[in-house]
A protein has these predicted regions:
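Long, terminal "pre-/pro-" and other extracytoplasmic accessory regions
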Residues: 2-4, 11-241
Length: 241
């Protein structure tokens, strides 16, 4: 009898611990989502207009925990409410937040920004610097500008029942943080607002490409998902920067 009671007690203890783990996990996810939304508002609330704000035309379609340079981050994806090009590699507004609430990056990939005149390099640098001053001032302390040049991001669209890829081009302000050797950049779109921002990126010098994961870039994410079961090393995945 004592043995049966001991066995039953052990089973109940296991189930109770499992229940507590699941409960804490769900609470943690909820808090993370709330903190991410709050942090985005805090990080961008002081920025001109709504350059890094979640567009009113979009809604949250996915949110998950991933790793960036071996550290936990939260990836959130917003797609258009009207369903226009609402698929992987299509239009989206995405954010990446660190566990401490730091905005690690965001991307606003919109068809509205394609095929329009771009601001000058001088104007783009001014816009990028002002964005950093308000949203990530710590990056300005030891900043070394590397380049200011046009850069394109692909977006797949459906037009008249046919799928095609167009390029959303902006002016990329690329710089290095001399304090730790990491890289960061701001891409200014045709509307003279930041359309993409990434920070604390690690670089593979010998391979002339970034080491950090590319969670804001659908082409990389798609390849990651497709090869996930094969556990393919990330060095074999496509790199866009």
């Amino acid at each position: 009898m004592n043995a049966k009671r001991s066995s039953l007690t052990s089973v109940l203890a296991v189930w109770w611990n499992l229940y507590r783990f699941v409960l804490v996990f769900h609470i943690g996810i909820g808090l993370t989502a709330g903190l991410s939304s709050f942090a985005l508002q805090a990080a961008t609330g002081a920025v001109d207009h709504d350059s890094a704000s979640i567009p009113d035309t979009h809604h949250l379609t996915s949110q998950r925990s991933v790793t960036l340079d071996s550290k936990p981050v939260v990836l959130s994806r917003y797609e258009r409410l009207d369903g226009r090009n609402a698929f992987l590699e299509g239009e989206h507004f995405s954010t990446v937040f660190a566990s401490d609430g730091t905005l690690k990056g965001f991307a606003n990939i919109s068809l509205e920004l394609a095929g329009k005149p771009l601001p000058s390099r001088e104007r783009s640098e001014q816009i990028a610097t002002e964005f950093l001053r308000r949203a990530a001032p710590d990056l300005l302390v030891n900043m070394k500008v590397a380049s200011v040049a046009p850069h394109s991001e692909p977006v797949r669209i459906t037009l008249a029942g046919r799928s095609e890829t167009v390029q959303v081009t902006g002016i990329k302000f690329k710089a290095r943080n001399l304090a730790d050797g990491s890289w960061f950049w701001v891409i200014v779109g045709s509307d003279e607002k930041p359309m993409l921002f990434e920070r604390d990126l690690q670089w593979a010098t010998l391979l002339a490409r970034r080491k950090s994961e590319q969670w804001l870039h659908d082409r990389w994410v798609k390849a990651q998902l497709a090869q996930q079961n094969d556990k393919t090393d990330r060095w074999n995945l496509p790199w866009t920067h």
